[in-house]
C-alpha cells in the first residue's frame, strides 16, 4: 500500500524524534519488560557518521528511522551501517510506512558510501523480522551490545 509519507532528516534531539523514541521505548517495556539500553550517542546520527529521520503523514510525526556507521563486518562488506530506531506508531502501521522508511535509510546510506546495512531486532517483534526478511535481509552473527542475547536476532543486507 502506498503512503504519502514525508521523510525529513532531523537531529535525534528534535522534539518529534524524542516523542517517537519515548513511544518505542514504552513499546519495549510492554514487550520485554524494560527499555532498550543499547548505547546511543547523538553524534552518531550526524554527518559523516549517520542520519536520523522522522516520517510524517499529513504533517503528523508517525515514524522514525536512522543509521549510523558500524564497525561490524558482514556479508563481505568493508563499510557498513547499523539501522537504528525503526518505529511506526500503531495508527500508521500496516500502511507501508516502515518499508518506505527502510528504503529511504538504505538509499541515503548507499549515497554515503555504505555497502551493507546491519541491524538487531527482538524475537518478540515478529512484524519487524517479517519486514526485514521480506526486504532481503539475512541472518548474521550477533554483534555489539546484543551479542549473546537470546532475545535478539541480527540481520544484514548488501546495498551496494
Residue ranges and their predicted role:
Residues 2, 10-14, 112-118, 122-160:
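C-terminal "cap" of GNAT-fold acetyltransferases
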Residues 2-84, 89-91, 102-104, 108, ...:
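Acetyl-CoA-dependent GNAT
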Residues 89-91, 95, 123:
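Active-site acidic-Proline motif in GNAT/NAT acetyltransferases
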Amino acid at each position: 500500500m502506498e503512503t504519502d509519507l514525508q521523510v525529513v532528516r532531523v537531529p535525534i534531539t528534535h522534539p518529534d524524534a524524542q516523542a517517537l523514541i519515548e513511544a518505542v521505548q514504552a513499546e519495549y517495556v510492554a514487550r520485554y519488560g524494560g527499555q532498550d539500553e543499547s548505547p546511543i550517542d547523538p553524534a552518531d546520527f550526524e554527518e559523516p557518521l549517520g542520519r536520523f529521520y522522522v516520517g510524517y503523514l499529513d504533517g503528523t510525526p508517525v515514524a522514525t528511522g536512522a543509521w549510523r556507521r558500524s564497525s561490524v563486518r558482514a556479508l563481505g562488506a568493508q563499510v557498513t551501517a547499523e539501522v537504528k530506531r525503526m518505529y511506526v506508531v500503531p495508527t500508521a502501521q500496516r500502511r507501508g510506512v516502515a518499508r518506505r522508511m527502510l528504503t529511504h535509510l538504505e538509499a541515503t546510506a548507499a549515497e554515503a558510501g555504505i555497502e551493507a546495512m546491519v541491524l538487531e531486532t527482538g524475537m518478540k517483534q515478529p512484524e519487524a523480522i517479517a519486514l526485514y526478511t521480506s526486504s532481503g535481509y539475512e541472518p548474521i552473527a550477533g554483534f555489539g551490545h546484543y551479542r549473546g542475547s537470546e532475545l535478539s536476532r541480527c540481520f544484514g543486507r548488501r546495498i551496494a
